[in-house]
Amino acid sequence: MFIVKAEIRDKKGKSFSRKLRIEDKFPGVLYGFNNTPISITMDHNLVFNLQKKEDFYKETLCLLIKEKKYTVKVHAIQRHAFKMKILHIDFIYAKI
């Protein structure tokens, strides 16, 4: 199982997302199963290297947010049109 570390993101919007990407981070969202969505940020290089593996999309992942573990699956990934960059990831809760 892959482990992805994330932090809760308080600010939202295009300008904040751009600032995150300058710091080699990117935004994401965790949602599903009647839970309130959690806005998160992740380290770009860590996730970029993990997503190169095919199992990243097939298996459930462990998302660590403030020492709390969430079992999730990748729902959608937005990538830059011509740069090797991830712009945003949507995760959904996974039932075990």
Swiss-Prot record:
Keyword annotations from UniProtKB, A to Z: Ribonucleoprotein, Ribosomal protein, RNA-binding, rRNA-binding
The Gene Ontology biological process annotation of the record reads: translation
| Pfam families, sorted | Ribosomal_L25p
* Any one Gene Ontology cellular component term annotated for this protein: cytosolic large ribosomal subunit
Top-level lineage group: Bacteria
> What molecular function terms (GO) are annotated for this protein?
5S rRNA binding; structural constituent of ribosome
Say yes or no: keyword Ribosomal protein present: yes
Name the HAMAP family on file.
Ribosomal_bL25
Q: How does it assemble?
A: Part of the 50S ribosomal subunit; part of the 5S rRNA/L5/L18/L25 subcomplex. Contacts the 5S rRNA. Binds to the 5S rRNA independently of L5 and L18.
Q: Which NCBIfam families match?
A: PRK05943.1
Relate the protein's function as given in its record: This is one of the proteins that binds to the 5S RNA in the ribosome where it forms part of the central protuberance.
The family note in this entry says: Belongs to the bacterial ribosomal protein bL25 family.
- Name of this protein: Large ribosomal subunit protein bL25
Q: Which organism is it from?
A: Buchnera aphidicola subsp. Schizaphis graminum (strain Sg)
Lineage here is: Bacteria, Pseudomonadati, Pseudomonadota, Gammaproteobacteria, Enterobacterales
